[in-house]
């Protein structure tokens, strides 16, 4: 089958979850004998962070005939002017850019590739394909987050594309109703992300001079919120002198990263709290961990969290965080706590205090993500 992936986001040297899932999906479809092409939008040219199979034909829509197609200054100005008043209208400027400057290239590539099915990673991509170009090729719209957001913070012009899709894929069972409630006749399938199943897991029983709390995720203030974890650790640092905190992930904003570093230095914990940057060895980082914490406000799935669970590491998250509160079963495979620093510190203290509890939750965590093994996820795939 000829499959086209439409991920209208950056891919070059991007270590984020969407890039990881996109590459994994493309590579798996090639392995299964399908013919795969990929459309993406990136201001840079170069290699992907995650290795893409050489058989996948990748097209950067933002580079056409050797020329960078960027958002014009007046569109940027309009987008930033609207942002404080209406995030929805601000996002719609991005859609207008795609309609005006990228639509023709998408048409050309559709004619060139002649796909039999298109897998879209964003409502914006689905809108361009189904509403603006009006393709007759089946389009499957994937949700990499909570689809409830589509009806509140996404441009209204993208919503009809959800109904026009041949099917919608969501990551968790609780997300099905968020689409079905609006479009009862729409086909919605639940297919989670593939989680690696590690044979060699974290040794939580080992006697160590130092224990590690691990965070892996992009350093984003209002999303992943690593500052809450740093503040919680500061509260416990004196009581647990043999513990340290490692934060792994790409910088999203220099000022925010500087504020994290300042927080660490102000509390004199430079030797115990480390901003480590991006890693290509997630398994190696997790294997050294004793506790994994994801203090996100929201998640679509929480891939780094699931990978930590597969490594047999006990986990902590916030009970009001979508996806996290489905992966973590409180006091079974980890701990869920109320939002905020104090509650997070209390949850951390429980696990830091008791190795037996860490071992118990870690073992259950590993079992609970076995359902996301590659053979289970790809076997359920509507594309296979």
Positions of the model-derived regions?
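A short, well-ordered alpha-helix in the C-terminal region of glycosyltransferases
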Residues: 343, 350, 357-371, 383
């Amino acid at each position: 089958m000829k499959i086209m992936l439409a991920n209208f986001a950056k891919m070059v040297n991007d270590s984020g979850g969407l890039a990881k899932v996109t590459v994994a999906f493309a590579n798996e479809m090639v392995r299964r004998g399908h013919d795969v092409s990929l459309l993406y939008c990136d201001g840079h040219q170069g290699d992907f962070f995650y290795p893409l199979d050489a058989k996948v034909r990748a097209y950067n829509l933002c580079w056409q005939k050797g020329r960078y197609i960027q958002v014009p200054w007046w569109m940027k100005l309009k987008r930033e002017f609207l942002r404080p008043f209406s995030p929805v209208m601000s996002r719609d400027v991005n859609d207008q850019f795609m309609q005006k400057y990228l639509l023709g290239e998408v048409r050309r590539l559709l004619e060139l590739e002649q796909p039999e099915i298109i897998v879209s990673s964003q409502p914006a991509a689905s809108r361009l394909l189904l509403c603006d170009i009006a393709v007759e090729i089946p389009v499957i719209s994937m949700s990499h987050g909570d689809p409830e957001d589509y009806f509140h913070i996404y441009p209204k012009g993208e919503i009809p594309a959800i109904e026009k899709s041949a099917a919608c894929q969501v990551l968790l069972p609780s997300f099905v109703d968020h689409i079905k409630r609006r479009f009862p006749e729409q086909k919605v399938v639940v297919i989670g992300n593939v989680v690696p199943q590690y044979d060699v897991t974290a040794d939580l029983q080992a006697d160590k001079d130092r224990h590690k709390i691990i965070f892996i995720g992009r350093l984003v203030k209002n999303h992943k919120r690593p500052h809450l974890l740093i503040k919680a650790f500061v509260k416990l640092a004196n009581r647990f002198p043999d513990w340290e905190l490692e934060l792994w992930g790409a910088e999203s904003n220099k000022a925010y990263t500087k504020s994290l570093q300042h927080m660490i230095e102000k509390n004199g914990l430079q030797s115990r709290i480390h901003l480590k940057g991006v890693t290509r060895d997630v398994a190696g980082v997790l294997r050294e961990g004793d506790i994994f914490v994801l203090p996100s406000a929201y998640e679509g799935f929480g891939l780094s969290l699931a990978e930590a669970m597969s490594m047999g590491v006990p986990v902590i998250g916030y009970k009001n965080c979508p996806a996290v509160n489905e992966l973590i079963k409180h006091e079974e495979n980890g701990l869920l706590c109320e939002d905020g620093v104090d509650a997070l510190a209390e949850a951390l203290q429980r696990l830091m205090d008791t190795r037996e509890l860490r071992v118990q939750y870690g073992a259950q965590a590993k079992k609970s993500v076995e359902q996301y093994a590659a053979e289970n996820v790809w076997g359920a795939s509507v594309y296979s």
